[in-house]
Amino acid sequence: MKKGIHPNYSEVTVTCSCGNVIKTHSTVGRDLNLDVCGECHPFYTGKQRDVASGGRVDRFNKRFSVPGAKK
């Protein structure tokens, strides 16, 4: 490997907003702050909530539905 062309690879501390601290190595050169990590992300914790906001079809059906009509 050539000398002087590679970035410095140092240990950094990654801190999540939930308080989880991860020590890793990176070329960033400074400590990082995360909003979400594997300890608090809803997908990994199993605390997901189903977002059923509806789409364009649901909005159309709601707007133009006839009250009392059969479905």
UniProtKB/Swiss-Prot annotation:
Pfam families hit by this protein: Ribosomal_L31
Gene Ontology CC terms, in alphabetical order: ribonucleoprotein complex; ribosome
Co-factor remark: Binds 1 zinc ion per subunit.
Binding site residues for Zn(2+): 16, 18, 37, 40
GO molecular function: metal ion binding; rRNA binding; structural constituent of ribosome
Cofactor names: Zn(2+)
Coiled coil location: none
Matching InterPro entries: Ribosomal_bL28/bL31-like_sf, Ribosomal_bL31, Ribosomal_bL31_A, Ribosomal_bL31_sf
GO BP annotations listed: translation
Keyword terms: Metal-binding, Ribonucleoprotein, Ribosomal protein, RNA-binding, rRNA-binding, Zinc
Oxidoreductase is among the record's keywords: no
Oligomer status and interactors: Part of the 50S ribosomal subunit.
Matches recorded under HAMAP family: Ribosomal_bL31_1 (MF_00501)
Family indicated by similarity: Belongs to the bacterial ribosomal protein bL31 family. Type A subfamily.
Function statement: Binds the 23S rRNA.
PANTHER family: 50S RIBOSOMAL PROTEIN L31, CHLOROPLASTIC, LARGE RIBOSOMAL SUBUNIT PROTEIN BL31A
Protein name listed in UniProt: Large ribosomal subunit protein bL31
Gene: rpmE
